[in-house]
Amino acid sequence: MTTAAKVNPLTSTDLGQLPRWDLSNVYAGLETDSLQMAVSDLGVQVDALDEYLDRHRISRTANPVPSQPASQAKPLIDGYLDRTNRALRLYSTVNAYVSSFVTTDSYNTTAKRLESELEMVGVRLQKQEVRFRGWVGTIKDALPSILEAGGPAKDHGSTYTKQPNKAVTS
């Protein structure tokens, strides 16, 4: 009577067919023109957001006026939020796509290079948000009337009213 040795699935080197994810509905590959254009467009959007913040003097320290009237601040808030949302949507898509390669193949140098590039963009987006929150803190008295007027400012209002101290000190 012979007994066949039982194979432990946790220690077996035969993994069978490994799962594959089809991400071609997002981008066709890491080195495709469409992904490179998306990364380039993201850089352009983040640069434009920096220019927007500079042009409108949006920062905690750049505005010498202690408070700005709601009629002047609302279009600035809406403009910032529209631009940021557009950049964040693209950043999230590209970052998730690249991360799917890095997490499944840590030796993929193209994916690692793109991940590093995207990390720098992510830091810039965070710095822009800190700058914007600081400015929102300088106009906190105008926020209620700005939020009542609707639009992107109202849609995101709870983000900036729940933590007013953070907006002032960021």
Model-flagged regions — what are they?
Residues 1-170:
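A well-structured
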